Every structure is written in C-alpha cells, then in structure tokens.
C-alpha cells in the first residue's frame, strides 16, 4: 500500500543520548552505593510510571530524594536529567523538511515532561512534526498496543499506509503486528534506502 504518513521515534533516531554523565552527576549528590543508586534510578516501576505520566517530574525527583538520598534541588535535577541529549541530529533537518513537504510526520516517543521541555527549548526538531504522541501524555509506553493505536488514529490513515522507524526491535515488532511498514533505525542513509523501498521518493532528496 502507498505510504500516506511517516512515524518517527525520537531518542536514538532523531536525537542521540547518553546517560553516563548524568548518572555520574546525580550519583555524586547521593550517599548510597553506586549499585544501589542505579537500582533506585532505573527501577522499572518508577521509570514506567514517570514516562506514562502517572507521576510528574517533581514526584520522580521526590522519590529519588527519599529513596536514594539525592541531595539536589528540582531545578538542578531537571538540568542534569536533561543533559543526556547530545548536540546535533541523527537525521538531518534537510531530510525532515523534505519529508514534511510531502507527508504528514508523526512523532511517537517514550519520554517524560522534563525531557520534552528541554528538547523544545534546545532543538527545532519537534517543529517538523504535525503531531506528537508522547508516552507521558497518552499513558502508554511502546511496545504496548495503546500508544500505537493512538498514533494510527492520529494519522487518519490505515496502519498499512504508515511507515514507522524506531531503533528498538521490540517496538518494530509491535508496529509490524499492526500492519505498518517498518524500519529499525541505524543511520540516515539506511533510513533513506528503506523509505525508497517502501515507495517514498526519497531518492529525490538524495539527488537534491
């Protein structure tokens, strides 16, 4: 089926990130062991609640203060927590602009309010997308079906007419179950090849 809309993941597709420096900075303000700190920080129950929007950033910060003895105030926590994002984009603005002129673009991301606030203030990438499906706003994390259902509904297109790219295999598998045309992201050049194979005239972008 002809592609009618294109869906992108955010982290590790559009913007690269690394938690190493942020984790070290947060750990430096704690009074527990590094192993225990990482257990607390990456507790799946709390991270998932945060990224589903069940708790806000201040509540997540309070949890870390109480459980990991984190000695850092909320504004500084937000600054450190958002320092994970690396400069530049993994997909060029030229490609995004080229696609935007021809297709509806939809962003589908597991994320949280602090990270999105930071990205809005420091990158232009969100402006290329017609709709944003953020996990903390819809109450669902990829690869759960609900977030994909929201994305399909937002597109107004049949799932088979959607092209979806994400770096994580489990999300690709979930999207494929809905019938989407999918590509596990590695590089921009491979994404362009996959778009071409799906019938998107991305070759014009390459030639231009």
Specify the residue positions occupied by each region the protein language model found.
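Active-site neighborhood of HAD-like aspartate-dependent phosphohydrolases
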Residues: 1-42, 177
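Generic structural signal for small/hydrophobic residues in well-ordered secondary structure
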Residues: 9-12, 53, 99, 107, ...
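Metal-dependent phosphoesterase signature
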Residues: 47-90
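Alpha-helical elements of Rossmann-like donor-binding domains used by nucleotide-donor carbohydrate transfer enzymes
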Residues: 21, 25, 45, 59, ...
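Asp-based, Mg2+/Mn2+-dependent phosphohydrolase catalytic module
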Residues: 1-4, 112-113, 117-208
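Short, surface-exposed acidic
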Residues: 30-41, 69-79, 200-206
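Conserved hydrophobic packing residues within short motifs/helices of P-loop NTPase cores
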Residues: 7, 106-108, 163
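Short, acidic loop-to-helix structural element flanking the phosphoryl-transfer center
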Residues: 75-106, 145
